[in-house]
Amino acid sequence: MRLISFIFLLFFYLNQSQVRKSIEAYRFETPPEIDGKLNESEWKKIKAADGFTLMRPVTKHGQKIPSDYETKAFLGYDDKAIYLGAQLNHPDPENIPKEFGRRDWGVFGKSEAFWISLDTFDDRFNSFGFVVSSAGIIADLYRSGDFGFSSLNYDTVFDAKVHINDQGWSLEMIIPYSAIRFPKKDIQKWGINFARKIVDLDNSEFSWNPVDENLFEYQESMGLLTNIKKINPPLRLFLYPYLQTAVNSQKGLKSSSSYSAGLDLKYGINNSFTLDLTLIPDFGQVSFDDTELNLSPFEQQFTERRPFFTEGADLFKKADERTGKFFYSRRIGQKINFNES
């Protein structure tokens, strides 16, 4: 009886084991122009990633994407960057939903969106995500750990363009190697997945490699990217200097002036450690918080967007990221006022 039970459980596990598609990257001789149009001849040489299936809502997981919304993705690379191209069909190209907004958060509006996830160490634990909407809004994020921590404050340097065509819309994206981290090997093997959000289908999300979140975390549901050869991790060095001056002039009074200068530096020591330095920080480039009226006796908490404090922020997350964190860095730099809550 025990043997029968064991065989049954083994069969059930194998039947439910995660499907893993694979795709080969194509090495570009000449990098494509990033304009959203897949008109370079080399795109036609790349085998497409297709056969997308429903990812969310999970209650209908596994359904094939409707033929009117056929989706194909193409991946290439050279010595400097990863290149993504995609054709996303739509039955009514002139009325593809598009909503403009700011970077990162704008992709969650009433627009179609397409994204790529890269698990560059193939550990099914961490991944980088890059998103572009049908309105051309881009977003990047970093996901880490069993707790599903994800951060839209990754804010690295990459670019993407979109183009409306007769079949729907297309996109091109460039992801420099400085935007990601990967092992120093002659032949790379990465986890990868592509996904598309379709507003006209109740915001349903379809993925290239099947994702069943009833059984597996998204991190465990990556396909496999192969054939990336002889690329080297670049020097990760970013300098952000600033200089500002002010002049105060009033009639009948002597003019006065002031100035300030500072520097932020980020240096990647290796794939595991990053050195962040800041000298007389200003953080003037960071977007302002939305105004909120606080009628509760508790402190308001806002998203940390200052680059110096976002590196390694996942270390201070609780098991459920929505319930808070062990360390709230936004208090650093505030004036002490015991009368404020």
Segments the model singles out, each with a brief description of its role:
Residues 5-17:
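Hydrophobic h-region of N-terminal signal peptides that target proteins for export
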Residues 17-341:
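Structural preference for beta-rich elements and adjacent junctions enriched in aromatics
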